Amino acid sequence: MTVKARNRLLALLWLGLAGVAATAMALASIYLYLKPGLPSVESLRDIRLQTPLRVYSRDMKLIGEFGEKRRNPITIEQTPEPFIKAILAAEDASFYSHNGVSIKGLMRAASQLIKTGSIQSGGSTLTMQVARNFFLSREQRFVRKFNEILLSLQIEQELTKDEILALYINKIFLGNRAYGFQAAAQVYYGKDIKDLNLAQWAMMAGLPKAPSTFNPLANPSRALVRRNWILMRMLDLGYINQDQYNQSITAPVTASYHSRDLDLDAPYIAEMARKEAVDLFGDNAYTDGYQVITTVDSRLQESARNALQHGLETYDARHGYRGPEQRLAPELLQDSDQLIDLLNEIPILGGLEPGVVTAVEPKKLQVQLRDRRVIELPWSNGLSSIRPYISESARGARLQSAEKMFAPGDVIRLRKVVKEKKGSNSSSEMIATAVDEPLNADPFADPESGDTEPAEPQVTEEWVLAQVPEAQGALVSIEPEDGAIRALVGGYDFRQSHFNRATQAARQPGSSFKPFIYASAIERGYTAASIINDAPIIFEETNLQDVWRPENDGGTFLGPTRLRMALYKSRNMVSIRLLQSLGLDYALGFVEGFGFERSKLARNLTIALGSSALTPLEMVRGYAAFANGGYRVEPYLVDRVLDVNGEVLYQALPLTVCDNCPEPGTGSETLSAEPVDLAELQLEGQGVDQGEEPAELHVLPVGPLDPSKSQARPRAPRAMSAETAYIMDSMLKDVIKKGTGRRALAMKRGDIAGKTGTTNGPRDAWFSGYSPYLATSAWVGFDSYGELGKNEYGGSAALPIWIDFMSSALEGLPERHLAQPDGIVTVRINPQNGLRTSYGGMFEIFRTNRVPGREVYNPYRNRYTDEDMDMPSHDSREDSLPEELF
């Protein structure tokens, strides 16, 4: 080699070294320039993925999900190995061998930059995609690419490959609000990622490249091409064998949109819990993956929803058929696709599906359903018993021909039912698929009764004509021990109206408010045997604005009446006279102790008849005090809130009944009556009885099942003394046994109690009641304050809903009663005057210092009628409030 050639080579060598040094210095300069602006990779270990707020029942059934991004993070161990192979084949086959950067990919990106002036394909590894998704924008800029490279190198140093892959699996956007592959699997296939097959895994692995372009919903053909390319890559890389490839490559595209499946239909509960979570944590509640665990019991919630819907439908059917919801233009019937689209826009309400009448014959209809089926609705499936609605109190004559009511294009409602034919000589029973209760096949038929003999059922599926009720209702049930809401339904269907009538509809409770006035009287010194005159009374008071002449239902008066009888017969005059004697200020103060707000209570005598506007939740809180022995509890819904890792962020500490704690004062006045001879009273009998021989009751404690749990909670204050609560419990049980709540005798339980309520019109129907297990209020009425119709009372409209729910809720539970306090004795009295007697009469319970005096026996005067002896009354109607109150 010549000297000249050697010098040239040496010069080139030095030039190369200088170039390398310059490049190194340039890269170092870029690194030093960009380094301060790079985020900390360590933060990836504690990264908070945007995860929606989820609401659960107490038994962890999903009730609701709130948030813009659907994400369900999973660990790498929960990710199927074949799916991981599909991701690597699609995105980064050398993931486990490179250091975070692909030189080949970078060279390709650099070539694009030189040729076009922009970076198009990116050349990104999985690590670089993680860096971009967590820290950087998706904009294709040169500086961002350097940041991406530097971050990727740091990530590879700080995290393991599995940790990086787990971040990728959970973070990346995959279309349709789905972030992460677990959420995407649920969106596109309605399954967890572990439950998909190889073809579906390959389809999912194709989404990150372009979630819109390769979306199996928006572009199924392009998504199929991408899937098949990934399957070929998996075969070439040895991830799958030829048989697996052949089977998967021919699989059809099966993706379809799946909304998040809820385990429990409780939208009113979900909305209440959402609001409370936002009140506690602000808007972070929507993104930080909080889990709200409510107090709701899923079984009771389903029973409550079914009971309310069934009760409203039954009430509605009693008042006639209002006709089709709408009539479509005839030309729509010629376009089946447009017809189906229209049907799919009509929401299913209460399980009632919309259908369009396509043909009408005198005794049947042909109906198009939203699933493209055309069914025949025979005369016997709801048509034969139609009586047209005229008003809430009047119906037309029974329909003789379907052509008189229906025409092609009519939109009607249908219920899908299962018909169990139990035998040739027995009637058929219709059981709704959407309702747990037996449902008559013909909802508009007049109720009939008949015995059926058990036989092997033959099950067939049918459709029955129905209609969405116009009346609304609410039901709420709480645990008397601490106020935990176990079930709440705020209306017929949340899709129909988001207005929560259980918590927002303040309506007049009518006679169901009377027990609070009676309790104030018992606490003040009255007894269940105190005599009050049930006679006409007229008031001329300025705060009543006019002359007020309250009446009893039917305009009848009983004269001198014991308080017990006055309550279960719901005598208005007795309630008014009682309140008048107590004084309004005292009564209002006492009633306030049940949790009612003073500002919501009427400041006149009409409060004795339930003229104050209250919500079902407020009413059930008051009745819980009768159920738990006299304590005021506060209803609550959210038991605890967990973060995304399951750590407790919030734990409710409700007021709790605690039998073992020192009892706080009641705040009531001390009674000044002289005690009677207790030894003498013991001879007359112990126990609880309302007109019958004393019977021994099986007593179970009403306090918390876990005493240690209650000790950490604040103690519930008393609303009334234990003695008053016990006496009121006894009197309210008589409402079931002998009064306006007798329909509940069908439950065949002795531990239930409550009170009906009906307001003028009638416009509102109530039943509030309880067992020691649950306190429950049910309300029925119109949002427009319209009248419910003739012969509709609390006992006919609301009580059946309460019975339906409580029968299910208490099924299998033994009877449970309040323990008799030490200060209670049972005494034989003369029912005509409430005095103690030794001859005949009936038994009554008293506080030991309020036992009445003994009467002078007169054999010619002491004759007791069935009415005196509290025998069951045959008048099932209850009182209504006079129009002057409204």
Predicted feature residues:
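Soluble, non-transmembrane domains of envelope/secretory-pathway proteins that act on or interact
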Residues: 1-3, 254, 259-260, 329-337, ...
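N-terminal type II signal-anchor transmembrane helix
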Residues: 1-56, 94, 113-114
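Non-catalytic, structured segments within soluble enzyme domains
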Residues: 27-28, 32, 118-371, 578, ...
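Beta-lactamase-like hydrolase cores
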Residues: 32-49, 197, 311-323, 343-352, ...
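A short, well-structured edge-of-sheet supersecondary motif
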Residues: 52-58, 79, 196, 353-370, ...
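Active-site SXXK
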Residues: 87-88, 234, 304, 362, ...
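Short, well-structured active-site flanking segments
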Residues: 96-106, 179-182, 241-244, 453-461, ...
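Active-site-adjacent helix/loop patches that line small-molecule binding or acyl-intermediate pockets
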Residues: 134, 296, 532-537, 551-596, ...
